[in-house]
Swiss-Prot record:
Leader peptide range in chain numbering: 1-24
Function of the protein: May mimic the function of prey elevenin neuropeptide. In vivo, intracranial injection in mice induces hyperactivity (tested at 5 and 10 nM).
Domain notes: The cysteine framework is C-C.
Keyword Signal: yes
Subcellular location: Secreted
Organism: Conus victoriae (Queen Victoria cone)
Protein family per UniProt: Belongs to the elevenin family.
Gene Ontology CC terms, in alphabetical order: extracellular region
GO molecular function per UniProt: toxin activity
Propeptide cleavage-removed residue intervals: 44-100
SS bond partners: C29-C38
Protein name: Elevenin-Vc1
Length: 100
């Protein structure tokens, strides 16, 4: 594979990863009912969330460990894809692994 093809592949994959909506951190309000985004009338109406102020940082500190433990399926797939691509790009052209 030519260097320009590798660069194009890396560019396309990086654009796909950065444009993906799955990267956005979402909170399930059924699970985290006291999260700042899930509080009040604005959250119940589904409109734009209101800024909660000083307690938002404290609430995020409490919910972040739970959010990290529930890694989305898309994130795992993208991580696996990036490992495969790193392995593919690290081998010189024409070199393949041989299994005995």
């Amino acid at each position: 594979m030519a260097p320009s093809q590798k660069a194009l592949l890396v560019l396309v994959l990086s654009m796909l990863l950065t444009a993906s909506d799955s990267w956005a951190r979402r909170i399930d309000c059924k699970v985290f009912v006291f999260a700042p985004i899930c509080r009040g009338v604005a959250a119940k109406r589904g409109g734009d969330s209101l800024s909660v102020g000083g307690s938002a940082e404290l609430d995020d500190a409490l919910t972040d460990p739970f959010l990290r433990s529930e890694e989305p399926r898309e994130w795992r797939e993208l991580t696996r894809l990036s490992r495969v691509l790193q392995t593919f790009l690290s081998h010189p052209t024409g070199e393949t692994e041989q299994h005995d």
